[in-house]
Amino acid sequence: MSELQTVRKKIHGNFFLEKTYKEGKLFYEVLRYKDDYIGINYGYLEDELREETYINDNRIGMVIVNEKDKIYICTLDEKRHEVGITVTYHNKSGRLAHEIDYLDDICMATNRVYKDGFIKNVPLIKSLEKRENIDKKYYKKYYEFKHKKNILRVEKIYCKKTRKRVDFKAYKNNKLYGFREVRDDNGNIILRGSHLNNKKIGIWHEYENHKVKIKVAFDENEKFTGIYREFFSNGDVKEEKYYFQGEEIKSKEK
């Protein structure tokens, strides 16, 4: 077995940037407050990059697993239950490969499979789906599931001119719940992240020209937490900051 080597860099007070190496390569990195993980945790595995968030030392919010061929995205609530929309995208084309809808960790629909850009095997969804005009520019398609006293509503908004999806989200009892994705009128990705109880929580990615520009995490009060990174177009880190409860943690080192 390969030995892991962990290096801790003090940022300020009880805040440390912790990096773990395996065979000389970066394997894991996270910001720590005392012994607790905070914000985005990066796991650099052999064939994938895994991103997840810890708040109060509990894994919560959007989880992203970026593999060679596909990107898997889900949302965990405070009980670590999978909630809202879980998606898998083809890495090369960016097309949606698979969608599963969860309400309180219960799978409500598994037949959201896409092949070559077309929906396949979706009789349940087709029978539930409704269409509604929003204004002259946009319309939405939506469907709902009920479980006990809770209602899951999955909603997709489209541009009438381009017919591209511009918003993809879910609600639990009329409050934003789980994964959300926002695109421009031409279908270019702008934002990805998660909500719980109508609030941003966990990892959010901001995009520019199809590439990640900013990675940041929000705590339960929608304040920045953990490692904040802004990137150049080639993927190199342009700026790195550290946050806790919305306040920047400034290193004493120059």
Task: Describe the role of every protein-language-model region.
Residues 1-254:
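Glycine/tyrosine- and acidic-biased, solvent-exposed loop/turn segments at the edges of beta-strands
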